[in-house]
């Protein structure tokens, strides 16, 4: 079997991106690194795939799109924007989803390359440490990230992306809760390792609480694809010190939270305030309306498709950060004098109160 650029990187003890720079722009690497790459290439008898680059120079008019899920309206709205902009540019679109699974992500990218797409628009689990993006860089395949924030992140090369500032947006959400008197704010999120967006929102949650002198509680993580919150997960969310507000890493999880709280006999926002992240239209159809941080999903898709067209044409395109908006909604209220579940009496020496649990609320099972 012929050696690959990944084999060369492993043999030399460096990244795929560094091997790519040594091959394509040797002036950008140190003489020592260049020597290591050349030695590894000779040892493995590796030759850069000039034929592959020539094939990709022939345009197909096909754009690949890799997204986590269309069940989440966030990505469906983004896809609408991508499709509109691509159609206006005379491009065809090929879509694959990954279900937040890194192996499926790898297979989707490989399939796209086999189909000889001109470029890719994609959302990946982690843009900081991603061998698939390193491979695209190495093979000079144009791509644009959506929702992955690559600016100012440690260990992360700056890559072309279209997103909001997730960390700053989460800080704004928590500051809105703090302004209403909330001091016990819990976070519900999908699996942090499956989404660098959720990880940045968690960082913003921590930033805002710590700036206010409040020790953040550990987040409660559940499956991004969950259709309902398990009783044990709700117990963890409501465990002492009892929260008066819940920040959810996306609107879909916020809607699951509200449904679970109501099934437990708790009122939103009278007993607990809930704020999500995304700005889904369905959240504004509820009564009360969902408080959320809104992202311009369709515009993210449009801007990403346009940026990709520029990259395919050979232009250098910097990351694009769009504005977010805080929608207060009806699920926010001032912090209650005592969290739900208390007897109404307070004791200045012991203000611990308890919510009903799945063990005491049989109907919630």
Task: Briefly describe each language-model feature range.
Residues 43-49, 103, 124-126, 258:
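Short gly/ser/thr-rich secondary-structure transition/capping motifs
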Residues 43, 84-89, 137-365:
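Bacterial carbohydrate/catabolite-sensing allosteric modules
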Residues 16-21, 56-71, 176, 184-191:
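Short beta-strand segments enriched in small/hydrophobic residues
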Residues 5-14, 19, 29, 37, ...:
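Hydrophobic packing within well-folded, soluble alpha/beta domains
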Residues 1-59, 336, 352-356, 360-365:
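N-terminal helix-turn-helix DNA-binding module of bacterial transcription factors
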Residues 50, 76-78, 107, 131, ...:
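Generic recognition of short, well-ordered alpha-helical segments
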Residues 58-175, 179, 241, 365:
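Alpha-helical recognition/docking segments in bacterial nutrient-uptake
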């Amino acid at each position: 079997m012929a050696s690959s650029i990944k084999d060369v990187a492993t043999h030399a003890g460096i990244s795929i991106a560094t091997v790519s720079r040594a091959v394509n722009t040797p002036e950008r690497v140190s003489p020592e690194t260049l020597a290591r790459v050349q030695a590894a290439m000779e040892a493995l008898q590796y030759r850069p795939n000039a034929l592959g680059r020539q094939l990709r120079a022939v345009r197909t008019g096909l754009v690949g799109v890799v997204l986590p899920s269309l069940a989440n309206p966030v990505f469906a709205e983004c896809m609408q924007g991508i499709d509109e902009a691509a159609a206006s540019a005379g491009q065809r679109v090929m879509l694959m989803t990954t279900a937040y699974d890194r192996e499926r992500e790898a297979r989707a990218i490989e399939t796209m390359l086999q189909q000889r797409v001109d470029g890719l628009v994609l959302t990946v689990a982690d843009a900081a440490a991603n061998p698939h993006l390193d491979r695209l860089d190495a093979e000079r395949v144009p791509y644009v990230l959506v929702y992955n924030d690559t600016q100012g992140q440690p260990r992360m090369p700056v890559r072309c992306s279209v997103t909001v500032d997730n960390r700053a947006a989460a800080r704004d959400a928590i500051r809105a809760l703090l302004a209403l008197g909330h001091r016990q704010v819990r976070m519900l999120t999908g699996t942090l390792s499956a989404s660098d967006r959720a990880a940045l929102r968690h960082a913003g949650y921590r930033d805002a609480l710590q700036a206010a002198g409040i020790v953040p509680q550990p987040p409660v993580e559940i499956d991004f694809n969950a259709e309902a919150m398990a009783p044990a997960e709700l117990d963890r969310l409501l465990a002492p010190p009892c929260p008066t507000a819940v920040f959810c890493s996306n609107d879909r999880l916020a809607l699951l939270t509200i449904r679970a709280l109501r099934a437990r006999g708790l009122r939103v926002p009278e007993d607990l305030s809930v704020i999500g992240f995304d700005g889904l239209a369905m959240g504004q159809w509820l009564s009360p309306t969902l408080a959320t941080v809104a992202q311009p999903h369709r515009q993210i898709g449009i801007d990403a498709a346009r940026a990709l067209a520029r990259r395919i044409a050979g232009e250098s395109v910097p990351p694009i950060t769009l504005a977010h908006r805080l929608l207060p909604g009806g699920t926010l209220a001032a912090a209650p004098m005592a969290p739900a579940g208390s007897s109404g009496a307070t004791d200045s020496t012991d203000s611990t109160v308890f919510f009903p649990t799945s063990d005491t609320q049989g109907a919630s099972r």
